[in-house]
């Protein structure tokens, strides 16, 4: 399957990407704009998030809120590639099964998230963690590291 999009320059260091359906994502080096490197992290968070929510929904996990926090370490020297990324899946709800959430994250990391799979083929490790908050309290754990 081939994917295609177009990136257009709009002066200075302002660009936008347009996909075949017409969706537009702006990019900028200016304050308040997303740089391409941050969009890469956003793509990873969005990709694994969509996978995890899909699997948790199928497993009937009773969650009210879900978010993904992504942080990364970069090399000092150019091209300043990412060397390690931490993806924290934060889930809040009632009676949440740690096993079901962990399995959803593992399936995303190992099977479904092509953004993570692509990054992990290079010189970058991706550590997926989870933080669950429900009536039992808050708990965290590392789920899986790839790359």
Feature locations, PLM:
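Extended beta-strand/beta-hairpin segments
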Residues: 1-42, 53-147
